[in-house]
Amino acid sequence: MCELRSGSQLIEHSTKAEERGLDFLSISDHIHPWLPEHEHSPFAWSVLGGVAAATSTIDIITGVTCPTFRYHPVIIAQAAATIAEMSNGRFTLGLGSGERLNEHVTGTEFPAVDLRHAMLHEAMDLMTELWTGEFITHRGDHFDADHVKIYEQAGTPVPMVLAVSGDQSLDLARDTRCAGIMAIDPDAELVEGWLERGGSAAGTWAEVPFAWEPTKEAGLKTARRFRFGIQGWEVAAELPNPAYFEAATQFLFDEQIGDAVPHGPDPEPYVQAMQGFLDAGFSNIAIVPVGDDFDATMDFWENDVRPQLQLSTGTTNGK
């Protein structure tokens, strides 16, 4: 979990993940952590450069970047193309419409989701144009670009994956020719909707938190670090800073957290959580280590969880 570790630790973990044979790495792109206790939130694009240089085979994805508020899409187009080149084509740009937590920080308005989707659509189209390697001038409803060319290219356009929650975002993924979708719930209707729109089952992404600890009691304490994800995205997208997430989650019962976040030494809750996504049709599942012991969490995955899964094309990461 990126908000629990420094940039240098994330790069170290990326090399360990590659050595263990994991398939991809995911990094969140935040300026704030979710909760005050998290303490870290390194600049994703600096870390990505380090990860691209330190690894050679493992795929890399942002989970996710919002290219429309604190960033301009021209800047993300250049950043993504650079990481794609540095990683020899191993990079995928995961995109979303943003959360107020991160996107209000430059003083811009954080509008309703329909307008955010319209801005994201324009940004994605603009980035796709820039990856052609031509000089681009764009005068849009939300963004302008003046005679700009991205010189650093990987040879092919950067594949894009879109965070989705329903028909509107699925339509956006289709209309912007995304390579895949990403979701936080094991919702088979999202996968079915993606396939109906011409998408590939291989381009479906999700994540599962792992609050592994040697005892159930310690695991529940660690699971509290992930309580920000229990309130639902309608709430999470609107809160402006970590203190608000602390206030919104302070009265959650241990039972609520324990039911939502797999924790402790018993592999069964982790197996159920991951199998739920696999059964819904998701192919790429990110492991989010919520505890401090990365190596022990990965050992637990390899020895206790993975052997019990009914896998087809499921893959894993250390987010």
Predicted features, each with a name:
Residues 1-319:
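Active-site-adjacent structural elements that line small-molecule/cofactor binding pockets in enzymes
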